[in-house]
Amino acid sequence: MKLTFLGANHEVTGSCTLLEAAGQRYLIDCGMEQGKDVYENQPIPVAPGEIDGVLATHAHIDHTGLLPLLVRNGFQGRIYATKPTAELCSIMLRDSAHIQEFEAEWKNRKGQRSGAEPVEPMYTIQDAEAAIALFRGYDYNKEIELAPGVIIRFVDVGHLLGSSSIEIWVTENGATTKLVFSGDIGNLDQPIIKDPSYLKDADYVFMESTYGDRSHGPRPDYVAELAKILQRTFDRGGNVVIPSFAVGRTQELLYFIREIKEKNLVTGHGCFPVYIDSPLAIEATRIFKDTDSSCFDEETNALLAKGIDPIQFPGLKVSVTSDESRAINTDPVPKVIISASGMCEAGRSRHHLKHNLWRKECTVLFVGYQAVNTLGRSLLEGADNVKLFGESIEVQAEICQLTGLSGHADREGLLKWVNSFEPKPKRVFIIHGEDEVENIFAQTLTEQGFNASAPYNGEQWAIGSEGAVCLKEGTRIRIEHHVSEGAARAATVFQRLLNAGKRLLRVIEHNEGGANKDLAKFADQINALCDKWDR
């Protein structure tokens, strides 16, 4: 059999791998890039019409977002996924298509003034509908024969509702080889969903490495941390804008805010309003509520048994239409605004940033991973100004992050997952990580006795029961991006350090009036850091 690595290699987004085995061709994921590409992408080396099926690990757009384009270009096979993944993709792919059409329309309106050629959307709602019709949803832990010699099974990996690792058994010439694609490995103790399952055997493993170079550290009290952020922002008279992934993270936030309200952890602001300003997040929340309880963890099922909706509470409001969304920023009452997209690359979150970033009393709270070259990453790294809808916006709001709040396992979680295989796989391919992170994690596994490597886009391997051989090296050609003067300055490592210093000053200002004990501890930590690095 043959494996070709097509996307999310030395990058985090755009997952796609081609498996050619037993006379069949399957893609494992078919994801969209989010943020600017780092390395040149490789085209799928076969015509879409010659692909027999797609195996989707989970519903996030960086794993499924190019399925409508694949269908548009001639794919007619089945798309295999868990039942919740199929349900979530039915809304997420429609939403993605809407964004493609909207952005093309906006560019065409703008381009008419300069005589530019019309822009076509990458794909349309009709393409998304056609892709959705090809989905087939399955239960966890059920063996599915795709074709003679190819059997798969979805196993809960605890990243998102419906997320899975995929076990693949390929039988050729009387010999069976087992592959495991990890999908995105979940963090431990997330609300609502179960922890990752651990597998025992595989010949070859293809695993993500998003946080392969770092630890999330001790699990914070997210409810208490979030309550503090809400309290100090509301006390200043500001809004808390939370750019959030519509699926998964939004529902997790609702779970936390329900607990905050139940325990009255934010005082002096009554039944403060919380807006879900994302039609996609609203639909995803409905799917969460309708999902079979077997997909939920014990704590969530215990709440349901008591008649408590774990993601519903007084003051929760939804805005579906554009008019409802715009009205949010005309209301002076301090509020929480949860809006997609989580990396601020599209969607209504960009409008809320435009209206709130320049206000010192407001807070922008990041609650998820921010990929390189995204607006969210720039804000976290201390950008002073950002451009939104053609306007330069000064960053005056407090910028903060719920650290450790992640749907991805950290280094320890990844190591726990891969060390569950006994004996060790013949080879572990490291994918879905930033450039240097993949190299670091591959080296970590090598030091622990694994045969590990981090392929680049376009790399091709022949694998079987007797071993693996690299047939073609991947490309390491970096894409040169035209960047503005401000973006170029921010790209330097030293500038990142300067930006971090500016952010520290803002954090110090935000702590004015805090308890003396906390301020003294904060000062000691800063002085200790200065003593370490003062040269």
What does each model-found stretch correspond to?
Residues 185, 218-223, 312-324, 343-345, ...:
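A general structural motif
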Residues 191-206, 293-300, 370-396:
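Short, compositionally biased "basic patch" segments
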Residues 150-154, 287-295, 415-417, 465-475:
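Short, surface-exposed amphipathic charged segments that create phosphate/polyanion-binding patches used
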Residues 387-418:
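Generic long, charged, amphipathic alpha-helical segments
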Residues 458-518:
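Charged, amphipathic alpha-helical linkers/stalks
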Residues 359, 434-477:
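C-terminal, active-site-flanking charged/polar segments
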Residues 229-374, 386-387, 422, 437-439, ...:
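Hard-cation-handling environments
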Residues 1-55, 60, 64, 69-252, ...:
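His/Asp/Glu-rich metal-coordinating catalytic cores
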